[in-house]
């Protein structure tokens, strides 16, 4: 599997955010998107996920035309954790597993992967910021998809949780998955190639 971008351009509010961006990511590879605030890192991930319109250029999976196929193969982990406060930890993950599907229906392994098993019956309203982030990361495990689009994935995570995330990412790549991540610092993807965006919005 290969994700290819050719001459991508992003325009927000009538202004160029970036233009002429090209890259390719194959199975087992990771791409780090870096750049200052406003350079378009989050916008690029949203474009790949199909959540933001591409001003010009193309995105293709395995050489096909851009369509819903990329979004169907991708997990997008953005800044918002998108949790329902009244639902328990397990219920929140079950909701997302059913929404994103198909999944096995058993969210216990995903909760264990982010060490939230002990909090499975706790309403999400009582979670700390780091625990909420870990619950969002659990979606990556609960519903396997080939492409992980991670926007500042280590935000609010303590050192132990960052180590667990790095291990999950390494396993994903080893199994043939791919990762495109946006971050200001290291997130545990030592062998990732880098694309630096330099044009402020």
Q: Which role does the model predict for each range below?
A:
Residues 54-72:
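Conserved ABC transporter NBD signature motif
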């Amino acid at each position: 599997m290969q994700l290819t971008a050719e001459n991508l351009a992003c325009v927000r509010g009538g202004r160029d955010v970036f233009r002429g961006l090209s890259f390719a990511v194959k199975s087992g590879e990771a791409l780090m998107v870096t750049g200052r605030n406003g350079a378009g890192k989050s916008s690029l991930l949203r474009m790949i996920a199909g959540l933001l319109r591409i001003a010009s250029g193309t995105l293709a999976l395995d050489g096909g035309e851009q369509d819903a196929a990329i979004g169907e193969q991708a997990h997008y982990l953005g800044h918002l954790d998108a949790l329902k406060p009244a639902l328990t930890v397990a219920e929140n993950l079950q909701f997302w597993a059913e929404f994103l599907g198909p999944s096995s229906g058993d969210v216990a392994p995903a909760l264990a992967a982010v060490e939230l098993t002990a909090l499975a019956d706790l309403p999400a309203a009582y979670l700390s910021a780091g625990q909420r982030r870990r619950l969002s990361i659990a979606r990556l495990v609960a519903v396997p998809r080939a492409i992980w689009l991670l926007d500042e994935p280590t935000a609010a995570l303590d050192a132990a949780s960052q180590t667990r995330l790095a291990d999950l990412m390494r396993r994903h790549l080893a199994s043939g998955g791919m990762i495109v991540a946006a971050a200001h610092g290291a997130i545990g993807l030592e062998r990732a190639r880098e694309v630096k965006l330099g044009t402020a919005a």
